[in-house]
Design a protein with these regions (language model features):
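Signature of N6-adenine DNA methyltransferases within the class I
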Residues: 1-12, 16-19, 27-34, 38-168
């Protein structure tokens, strides 16, 4: 009924249609600054649900993606695929008011990846400003993705002056 009253207000979900400034491409290979340029004081919020692939389950192309983003980090071969988004996010928000948050595998917050990923993010002045405790996530898809995730929000520590939150 809304569609009848307000033309083009409600679109069918599928098939996907071009809308706004959605860019289709490999996020780890694209230049985020070119796609979404921002100034120091602009409020920009990146958020997403990047793919969850452990280091042992990545294809050769995905391993190359991680190397292109994290290749200067000692031990980058042990990183989950999603770690690339955290590193690119840290570069993107550096010295600005921009922030990012991702639904992520909980493995980047525990175990061997912590010593590889988080020191690099802290060197880039990134700091966790909110986090949700790990929880099981599934979906209704045919091949239901049963995974334990957490949600982590990050800001540049020089530009963030608010309270930090941990949600249980």
């Amino acid at each position: 009924r809304l569609e009848e009253e307000v033309h083009n207000a409600v679109r069918p979900t599928l098939p996907l249609q071009k809308a706004g400034a959605i860019v289709c491409g490999n996020s780890l290979r694209l230049d985020w600054e070119e796609i979404l340029p921002h100034g120091r004081d602009d409020e920009v919020y990146l958020f997403g649900n990047p793919p969850y692939l452990g280091a042992r389950k990545q294809s050769k192309d995905q391993k190359d993606d991680i190397k292109s983003v994290c290749g200067n980090m000692k031990g980058f071969n042990s990183l989950d695929y999603i770690a690339g988004w955290f590193v690119k996010g840290a570069r993107y928000i550096r010295s600005s008011n921009a922030r990012y948050a991702f639904v992520t595998t909980n493995s980047i917050n525990q175990g061997e990846q912590v010593s590889v990923l988080w020191p690099e993010l802290y060197r880039k002045n990134s700091d966790i400003v909110f986090a949700y405790q790990s929880f099981k996530w599934g979906n209704n898809a045919k091949n239901n993705a049963q995974v334990t995730v957490s949600i982590v929000g990050v800001a540049d520590e020089e530009y963030f002056s608010g309270d930090k939150f941990l949600f249980f």
